[in-house]
């Protein structure tokens, strides 16, 4: 059974091009206004909402008067350039009507695949959320090439959801969920309200639902589900064609829930602790050990020694003074800067480095404290 959306902590909403843009008239303003009302209601209830929005190319086609036929790469990128401006303005106007600020973030594949760029992208989005702004995220279609693109915003939305530790991803589309077969082709197709695991049998049910306005079909949505569920994020596929598409979920309108097996934070920290070899080591004092065990970030003041040659965003092991690993995490400094600020208070860092740096050497969200039985000698 679906929970109420207000019971989630952080939700990523992906919006398909066909929902936002009409080929003849352009932006579907009334629909977008109804979405804005839903987002405002969720934010008022304490839920953080991020939007991954398609529509830049589709909207840019209408802005530039491009033909309905398939576009060349350079035409698509020109359409994206024009459409991104119009799309950002539309979101700013609609959300602004509810007293909500928004910020546009254009990403490429490497922004969520390369650790340092990943950390930068995540820090920017986190800051927007702390400022009560709604991040409006899209692939940077003006510069992305075939070799370095997501190819669809379903998978981009899943990457954003896992990067940000969201507990729910909602894919709004012109399809109201998953069926045992494409319902427009098979009248006997049965609707599936709940999917526990995306198996090969489930994947075989996907049909091609992409249109000339969008690149994603059901297959890409199931791919997104695998990414999200593996990282601890639940996913909902539902129709966005009705007004108030998010509140419609709470009203019981048809939707398919793909449930995650574990919590997002656990999945993220499992990735840190289990899948990455540390590129360096930090030796910390007893006060820092106590702080880490109580769930706090690692500050430079508690670091006594820095070993290794690492870059910002690399994984490092945190050792106590007896040489035992007590934690592991993603470091916010490269090795040279870490050595400079080790042992210093956070308010001294900017003067030492000559630029405004992060206060924590390892933020608690990027830190896994090992249980006593897991700690091992260096």
From Swiss-Prot:
Cross-referenced PROSITE patterns: GLUTAMATE_5_KINASE (PS00902), PUA (PS50890)
Enzyme Commission numbers on file: 2.7.2.11
UniProt xrefs under Gene3D superfamilies: Acetylglutamate kinase-like, PUA domain
Pathway: Amino-acid biosynthesis; L-proline biosynthesis; L-glutamate 5-semialdehyde from L-glutamate: step 1/2
Encoding gene (name): proB
GO cellular component assignments: cytosol
Residues noted as binding ATP in the record, renumbered to the chain: 14, 173-174
Organism: Brucella abortus (strain 2308)
Residues at which substrate binds: 54, 141, 153
Keyword field: Amino-acid biosynthesis, ATP-binding, Cytoplasm, Kinase, Nucleotide-binding, Proline biosynthesis, Transferase
Similarity comment: Belongs to the glutamate 5-kinase family.
Name of the protein described by the UniProt record: Glutamate 5-kinase
Residue ranges of domain PUA in the record: 279-356
Catalytic activity as recorded in UniProt: L-glutamate + ATP = L-glutamyl 5-phosphate + ADP
SMART domains membership: PUA
Function field: Catalyzes the transfer of a phosphate group to glutamate to form L-glutamate 5-phosphate.
Cysteine pairs bridged by disulfides in the record: none
């Amino acid at each position: 059974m679906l929970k109420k959306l207000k019971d989630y902590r952080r939700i990523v909403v992906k919006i398909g091009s066909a929902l936002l843009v009409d080929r003849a008239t352009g932006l579907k303003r009334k629909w977008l206004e109804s979405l804005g009302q839903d987002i405002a209601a969720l934010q008022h209830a304490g839920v953080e909402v991020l939007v991954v929005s398609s529509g830049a190319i589709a909207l840019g086609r209408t802005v530039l008067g491009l033909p309905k036929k398939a576009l060349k790469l350079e035409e698509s990128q020109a359409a994206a350039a024009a459409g991104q401006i119009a799309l950002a303005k539309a979101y700013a106007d609609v959300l602004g009507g509810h007293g909500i600020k928004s910020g546009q973030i254009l990403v490429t594949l490497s922004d969520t695949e390369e650790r340092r760029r990943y950390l930068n992208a995540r820090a920017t989005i986190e800051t927007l959320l702390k400022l009560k702004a709604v991040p409006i995220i899209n692939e940077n279609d003006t510069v992305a090439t075939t070799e370095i693109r997501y190819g669809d915003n379903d998978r981009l939305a899943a990457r954003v959801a896992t990067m940000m530790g969201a507990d729910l991803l909602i894919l709004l589309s012109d399809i109201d969920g998953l069926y045992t077969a494409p319902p427009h082709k098979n009248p006997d197709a049965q609707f599936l309200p709940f999917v526990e695991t995306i198996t090969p049998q489930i994947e075989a049910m996907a049909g091609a639902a992409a249109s000339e306005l969008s690149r994603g079909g059901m297959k890409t949505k199931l791919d997104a589900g695998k990414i999200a569920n593996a990282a601890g994020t639940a996913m909902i596929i539902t129709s966005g064609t009705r007004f108030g598409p998010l509140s419609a979920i709470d009203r019981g309108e048809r939707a398919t829930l793909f449930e995650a097996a574990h919590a997002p934070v656990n999945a993220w920290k499992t990735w840190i602790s289990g899948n990455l070899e540390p590129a360096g080591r930090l030796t910390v004092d007893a006060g820092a050990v106590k702080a880490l065990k109580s769930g706090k970030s690692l500050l430079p003041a508690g670091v006594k020694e820095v070993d290794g040659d690492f870059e910002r965003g690399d994984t490092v092991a945190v050792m106590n003074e007896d040489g035992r690993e007590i934690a592991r995490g993603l470091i916010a400094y490269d090795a040279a800067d870490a050595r400079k600020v080790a042992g210093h208070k956070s308010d001294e860092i900017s003067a030492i480095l000559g630029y405004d740096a992060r206060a924590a050497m390892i933020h608690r969200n990027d830190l896994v404290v090992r249980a006593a039985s897991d700690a091992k000698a260096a």
